[in-house]
Amino acid sequence: MDPAPSLGCSLKDVKWSPVAMPLDLLVSTYRLPQIARLDSGECVEGLRENDFLLIHSCRQWTTITAHSLEEGHYVIGPKIEIPVHYAGQFKLLEQDRDIKEPVQYFNSVEEVAKAFPERVYVMEEITFNVKVASGECNEDTEVYNITLCTGDELTLMGQAEILYAKTFKEKSRLNTIFKKIGKLNSISKLGKGKMPCLICMNHRTNESISLPFQCKGRFSTRSPLELQMQEGEHTIRNIVEKTRLPVNVTVPSPPPRNPYDLHFIREGHRYKFVNIQTKTVVVCCVLRNNKILPMHFPLHLTVPKFSLPEHQVKGDMWPETLVHHWLGICQEQFDIDEYSRAVRDVKTDWNEDCKSPKKGRCSGHNHLPNSLSYARDELTQSFHRLSVCVYGNNLHGNSEVNLHGCRDLGGEWAPFPHDILPYQDSGDSGSDYLFPEANEESAGIPGKTEVPYEELWLEEGKPSRQPLTRSLSEKSRCDTLRGSTRSTCAPSSPPTPATLGATIKSSEIALPPPPVPPKSEAVREECRLLNAPPVPPRSAKPLSTSPSIPPRTVKPVRPQTRSPSPTLSYYSSGLHNIITQSDTSPPNSAPVSCYPCTRVKSDSVDPKSPFGSPSAEALSSRLSWPNHYSGASENQTRSDFLLDPSRSYSYPRQKTPGTPKRTCPAPFDFEGCELLGSPPSTTSAEFSSSGVPSCPKSASYCLENSEDNSFAAGMTKQSVSCPALPPRAPKPVEQKATPETSPLPLKIDGAEEDPTAGSLDLSEDQYFVRKGMQDIFSVSYPFSSPLHLQLAPRSCGDGSPWQPPADLSGLSIEEVSKSLRFIGLSEDVIAFFVTEKIDGNLLVQLTEEILSEDFKLSKLQVKKILQFINGWRPKI
């Protein structure tokens, strides 16, 4: 069956390239189909030396692994693979779990909590609203809306109590001011109570939820879809979409026959569907005398090497004609779709040790959990828990994928090493579903130790670790894709010293990691915080990529960080401070970072680099957070960073310029100014520590810092309050080497302690923020008016000297309390202002009517406050 004489020669006369390449590299480099010859010395079952092959296409196969069953549910015989598009039908049998755990039905959350099964399913749509209080000392409330859809799978995690609020409002003139500035009515009377609730994981939304016991609705330990499936006959695709594997089935009627079947499914046989798996295969046709033999090579296994025609390697067009000739012959004798739908035995050399996406390093062929361990080890080890096709019929079983044109980040072709395979995604019938595939290591490759998920995305550019499979966001880097299919390639093997620089540079591109699969520890942490995302671990300390940067010797004390929670109010969470693209950008004199600074020391700057950069360890110890700013380009400004709508909620909010109390010194100059060029300044500060008013919103820390003493005497301090957040990787700035500096003494507002003065040299962007037992901190910012500093010091009542500024609108709640104490008001009045959360912006809008009638103050107290607002200060 040689080609026609017009082609000029037969396959035996073709001059083959002396360089052979592995099949995975071949299909990623050249368009398919291609004619190839098995390299001499390669030993492949079913192939002879120097066999000619037509490499037809790459296919992504989705199959269900099944066992044959005897009476009594005993598993016998080898495993088989049934394609998801298998045309035969099956009938569900009584399941093992039905015997061990009979189906239960519930009519309320309280009934579910009493029985506390492992999981329940929602049998009808449920909507429930509850008003949640932020805390014992906080009168903010938030309406907690709960919506459950029919079929939602809920894994029970535990029980807790939430504070619910019963509010009956009073008419108050203060309400007008609160509404005017967008705040809730805090004058309303608030009654609180504790409500027991059931904490569950909703696998449709991938979120933990708190269901109050009062919530009514029908629940069951079996999915409503699965209960409907008990009757009738169903395709295998329908079964795996609507039931939870493993599941026992029988063959009720004679199944269709496929000429390529290697295992024959017969009427009356019983099977246990164990799990679902997806693998990428290269389908080929062996070209022999008057015979076409189809075969396939799974890319997760070791693949053979092939040689291409020399003309093809050189880019000539002649081999194209030869390829199309043989392709036409193959299509006459070979149906690739039928071949892809064949039932086959599972090969014994397939390693099933990998059951978690974190284990192993190849993803070409993947397994979901084994049948005998389907009881929950992790929340990730269930077909439905990984957002499979229950919620959108997205199974693909015979889709063609195109690996051609994929390059790695460095611009080189990315071959598939035999122990690193691409994470494939294929869109069949418009599907965007990517199977949650666990990894399997190739035969003969020793298993690698498990790597924490966060580290997978932190150390891609490090020479000490093998580059890992790309994130899904890199799919756009593939040059050409066929149809609606998509694919990703693994990065090439570890970089050599000559190419290390380029590799590290490419790794600095801020690519977000894919979403973290829900793990039991993370979910329990979520539930503990009532639907708050789990705080990423602080312990991830990546090694430095530059050996010339020594490790940091002094570490600042990092403040504790509290995750935003639905029980926090709209204002206390900081959400109201997010600005939009239309907002005015802040002036250069008001940096917007509120991080506890991580200082860049003189010995941490690479002298060869035009920019001083901190060491890797000196950067954030929480780089597992999606820090888009790390490694950003030099022309990116802080406004670009803060205004990007894709940023995580956990970054600081930027206050509008009308309320400058939210600004504070940034640890780095994002405008690129030389901060260290000026002479070092000498600054004195006082340490003090004491109690704060009951239930404060934050502990106010005042940082004394100025260019010189005379300038410091003429500047006012203004405190800002914002949630304590982890230090981020800063934009590199030009810096000059400075002598080793010591931590800057702090003055803690409202505290009593023996003051200690110290003199030290530092620049404006080098300081440590010390953290006590508070979750919120404030850093003083030099205010525009120096008038109040001309007044003599006076005690605030707690021992710390402080004078109010001339402009009161920017004061924090704590500073308003100090101001009232400064003018001699009683502690009960001050406590009332704290309870009502009166800050400077509210203080200047108070009227005599509000103070006397709503605040119930005496005439003298009202007069003092109004005169104080108008500029009066008591003389000492």
Curated annotation (Swiss-Prot):
The gene is Garem1. Residues 427-448, 460-501, 530-572, 630-664, 722-759 are annotated as: Disordered. Keywords: Mitogen, Phosphoprotein. Residues 12-320 are annotated as: CABIT. GO terms for biological process: cell population proliferation; cellular response to epidermal growth factor stimulus; epidermal growth factor receptor signaling pathway; multicellular organism growth; positive regulation of cell division; positive regulation of cell population proliferation; positive regulation of ERK1 and ERK2 cascade; response to epidermal growth factor. Acts as an adapter protein that plays a role in intracellular signaling cascades triggered either by the cell surface activated epidermal growth factor receptor and/or cytoplasmic protein tyrosine kinases. Promotes activation of the MAPK/ERK signaling pathway. Plays a role in the regulation of cell proliferation. The modification Phosphotyrosine is found at Y105, Y453. It comes from Mus musculus (Mouse). Residues 811-876 form the SAM domain. Belongs to the GAREM family. Residues 560-572, 630-639, 647-657 have a biased composition (Polar residues). The keyword Phosphoprotein applies. Interacts with EGFR. Interacts (via proline-rich domain and phosphorylated at Tyr-105 and Tyr-453) with GRB2 (via SH3 domains); the interaction occurs upon EGF stimulation. Interacts (phosphorylated at Tyr-453) with PTPN11; the interaction increases MAPK/ERK activity and does not affect the GRB2/SOS complex formation. Disulfide bonds: none annotated. GO terms for molecular function: proline-rich region binding. This is GRB2-associated and regulator of MAPK protein. Pfam families: CABIT (PF12736). Residues 498-550 are annotated as: Necessary for interaction with GRB2. The modification Phosphoserine is found at S609, S613. The keyword Phosphoprotein applies. On EGF stimulation, phosphorylated on Tyr-105 and Tyr-453.
